[in-house]
Amino acid sequence: MDVIFLKAGIRFLGLAAVATVASGVALGPARAELLARVPAAREMAVCGDTLFVGTKGSSVYAVPLSGGRARRAASGFSAPNGVACSRGRLFVASRDRITAFEIGRGGTLNGRRDIRRGLPNSGGHSFRYIAVGPDSRLYVSFGSPCNICLPRGLQGTIASMNQDGSDLRRVAWGVRNSVGFDWRGSTMFFTDNGADRMGDDIPPDELNVLRQGGFYGFPYFGGRIRLTGFEDAPPPARQIAPVFNFQAHVAALGIHFFRSLGGDALVAQHGSWDRSVPVGYQVVRLSFRGGRPVSATPFLRDVGRPVDVKEALDGSVLVSDDAGGAIYVFRR
């Protein structure tokens, strides 16, 4: 496998033939470039010719997809991890609220309005993911506040609401910490991070299919494995098992189905901290057959700590890296 260094100092391992080019590297049919520097970059939203980027800090950034520096588009948040756009508006999911903006020319944001306040305290799992479903509702994740414990209220759930913040509904529960979901047709798939401190190889990270109102096992199960402290406790409902297991501790976060990949998905694996030999730190291609995931293979490696993946209008792959404070674009 060839090793190449970009000008930005990030290393890429080509999975096929690799040819160096002046402004980046070619990975088979793709070319890797640094699109912009964004501090602690997290979820991304492609909104016309602007890429909005949530962060772990206090600001949301706007990046011109045609090239140029990122600029601070809005501030005054507490960890505005989640961003999504619909009908000319941007929605920002932070620790304690959902905020809506009107998107103006050049990606300016106007008319700031909190549409939902008082979100549950999710402790160390307070990085909300947000997306607009095929039904035009907003879907938001609410992590559990712990490694393994009984969540309360909306902790450990995924919920949906109207775009004005009304009609909040719990659509999934028993979810430890989902920081990524997307739709394949009308079917929603979501990642979920497995528990820590149970060993190098258990429990797995999960990929699940949303069944409205379904129970996904936490804190009783991680995959099909009983979790520490709840081995003999009777679960409150029948568990909906994962449709695919990722390796334990890879920290599977953002997932996106790509038109340019024939309906396959890319998944950002943020990387382990609770394992003797580190795993993850890559983007994998999740291949589907007959509507079901069958394998996950490395697509991009050594791209820092990838958080989210999105498809630009031209089919390019966008990757956010919160550790390196960067957005990368992989052009065909």
Identify the function of each model-found stretch.
Residues 29-37, 67-76, 103-121, 151-180, ...:
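Blade-edge beta-strand/turn elements of extracellular beta-propeller
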Residues 35-58, 250-257, 267:
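Beta-strand-rich domains and repeat architectures in extracellular enzymes and scaffolds
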Residues 40, 76-79, 126, 154, ...:
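Beta-rich catalytic cores
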Residues 46-49, 85-87, 132-135, 182-185, ...:
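Residue-level detector of Asp-centered blade-edge/turn motifs that repeat once per structural unit
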Residues 53-54, 92, 139-141, 189-192, ...:
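Residue position within the beta-strands of beta-propeller blades
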Residues 59-61, 97-99, 157-159, 206, ...:
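A short loop-to-beta-strand structural motif that recurs across blades of beta-propeller domains
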Residues 127, 145-147, 161-164, 176-177, ...:
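Beta-propeller domain segments
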